[in-house]
């Protein structure tokens, strides 16, 4: 279980993309937690996955999650906002693995007949901005949006298990959060000089 399954490239948000070690246990635990506790993927579902399989969102949250529960998956080499809803209808995809910009592109498309009564009821991913969340959920009638936050090489992550709007959810890790002043580019402190 602790054996190395593969190396996966990080997104590069904290610097140059790098290869991160992925043990087998992390694949199993990650995909199982996402499917069962997160967006409740089952063998009756078909997932739309247009993300690269060399990144953890497309591979772990997408393909491995489907394998974990015996769900089908429609893998698209390249995302196209104009053909998305037609493909969703054609392949009856009930789940969608995303990064936030895909949701923005879909929201900026003119309404089309295929988006009405679309079968997508659940989605999982990262980067869906709060200012777009309600618009996306309401326009496309998505029941469960499971936003996650974590790094490929991290030991844990945040997950929106309770399907609350505009949140990355919770974690089971013992962590502390601090207030950050973006304008001053530093942590906020109280009158005693302690971090808030």
Predicted segments, located by residue:
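Short beta-strand->loop structural element characteristic of the AMP-binding/adenylate-forming
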Residues: 18-21, 49, 71-78, 146
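Short hydrophobic/charged patches on amphipathic alpha-helices used for structural packing
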Residues: 8, 82-85, 112, 134
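Conserved AMP-binding A3 loop
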Residues: 5-29
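Gly/Ser/Thr-rich phosphate-binding loop
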Residues: 68, 90-98, 107-185
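Alpha-helix capping/helix-boundary segments
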Residues: 80, 102-103
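Conserved ATP/PPi-binding loop(s) of AMP-dependent carboxylate-activating enzymes
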Residues: 182-196
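Conserved AMP-binding/adenylation subdomain of ANL enzymes
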Residues: 28-46, 54-94
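Conserved pre-ATP/AMP-binding loop-to-beta segment of ANL
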Residues: 1-9, 16, 39-46
